[in-house]
Amino acid sequence: MNLPDYSPNNSSLQWERFSELLWHNEELGLWVDISRMNVNEHELKELKPIFQKAFEAMNSLEKGSMANIDEERMVGHYWLRNPDLAPSRDISKLIANQISQIEQFTTSILSGDIRSDAGELFTDVLWIGIGGSGLGPLLLIESLQELNKGLKFHFLDNVDPIGIDKKLELLQSKLSTTLFVVVSKSGGTPEPQIAMDQARHVVETNGKNWPTRSVAITMCNSLLDNKAKQENWLKTFDLPDWVGGRTSITGAVGLLPLGLIDSDLKSFLLGASKMDELTRNNELLDNPAALMAMAWYSSGSAKGLKDMVVLPYRDSLEVFSRYLQQLVMESLGKKNDREGNIVFQGLSVYGNKGSTDQHAYVQQLRDGINNFFVTFIEVLTNNESPCLNNKLPGDYLSGFMQGTRLALSDSNRQSLTITLKTFDPLSLGALIALFERTVGLYAELININAYHQPGVEAGKKAAADILNLQLQIEDILSDYSNYSIEQISTRLSSSNSESIYFILRNLVFNNKYSAKGSWKNPSSLIFKREKL
């Protein structure tokens, strides 16, 4: 092989490079082009032995090795789209049975065989889940739901009280025909628990029965699972401990919403499974995920020094950059490598959609700081929009994408391009699986664990500590006496005066306590609990 270096200003050499590096699969109708990433022949040769170790590690993971050492768990999202790969018959049966149950349940909901307790057809879904439990379903709904087909989805993915009130107020007249789906792997994550409690309160204060219109997706024997079974909820689906939230989209977390919008969940699984097969190829240039992982590695000097800007030129993929933010950044953003060395790894991801972004931050991408590479995503097949004034929308969209790609290259800005022949459940499943495998391979190249999230757990613990501190502060103020921040800090033997200030400010402006003094001068403030 004689691969020319990245030569944006030499069209002849760049064409040769493009032809050498282009990957295509006819069955999936998918192309991957890394020719405008700064990968050279020397790196190809140098990375081959490292990639062989990465391929072996991924093979071991798929066979059931303890990939998540921190939690002593296997990592099995690849089994979800091909149950025969699972390391035991019990797991294979569990996956196959769950797919069948989801198909039966969603078909019964849509046909009216399963109705509300008032005998009405379900019309809406309130999906309660955070992180991967919310982003994955949101991506599927925004990407694949057809007009006037299936149930209408609404999402509670935060504990913003105003946001919760707005969603519940919107559903006020539809409570009797709304299906409530609560997703929480452990069953104890505060955000979905709080959102569920708020939704349940509205349902029950309006005289409706919560269990008869509620579905849980959670681990077997979790707090939520036990509650749902004790109260005889409409249905529960299993979220196995070997599936992480950010890779749960081909399990019940993704298949249930697909079924409820009457989309082809089998094709979605097939697309992911087919891409899994293609990305098991140990030949570097014949494996699209390996090509992308190599491009990430080269572009960021193996340290994630360049951000990834995701530009999908299709409205249906507008949520995809947010989905990739979690998949990539939660997986790769690690302080330590596998040996415990401090490495501060990661890959920052942001984006929206083209051609909107051409009128936003593409100006900086072309002429500003060169600290990124772009991932373009295009779809070739368009609908039958009329040709008006000799103009077709799809032609212009494609032209804008190609023009942006060339304009960036002219300024020596790197990009890779993923092209889909059509956009449907099959191609979306393949696209998601492509990025999942790329993340896994890249993590092996930089020697980090992609399947744990100690930073997330640290954030949860810190939040719990703050909430506990608030309880202690409120206990002190319960005697209706005046207290300064310094006095409260002394009573609590706490040096965290800043957090005490933030907590008290929140309490005061939510009409629980009064404050005298200047907010600009925290030491002057005196707080008191008001008698009702």
From Swiss-Prot:
Keywords per UniProt: Cytoplasm, Gluconeogenesis, Glycolysis, Isomerase
Annotated GO CC locations: cytosol
Active site: E330 (proton donor), H359, K460
EC identifiers of the protein: 5.3.1.9
Subcellular location: Cytoplasm
Biological processes per GO annotation: gluconeogenesis; glucose 6-phosphate metabolic process; glycolytic process
UniProt xrefs under Pfam families: PGI
A Gene Ontology molecular function term of the record: carbohydrate derivative binding
Gene3D superfamilies: Glucose-6-phosphate isomerase like protein, domain 1 (3.40.50.10490)
InterPro entries in UniProt: G6P_Isomerase, Phosphoglucose_isomerase_CS, SIS_dom_sf, SIS_PGI_2
Enzyme class label: isomerase
Swiss-Prot/TrEMBL catalytic activity: alpha-D-glucose 6-phosphate = beta-D-fructose 6-phosphate
Pathway: Carbohydrate biosynthesis; gluconeogenesis; Carbohydrate degradation; glycolysis; D-glyceraldehyde 3-phosphate and glycerone phosphate from D-glucose: step 2/4
HAMAP family the record matches: G6P_isomerase (MF_00473)
Name used for this protein in its record: Glucose-6-phosphate isomerase
Organism expressing this protein natively: Prochlorococcus marinus (strain MIT 9211)
Lineage: Bacteria, Bacillati, Cyanobacteriota, Cyanophyceae, Synechococcales
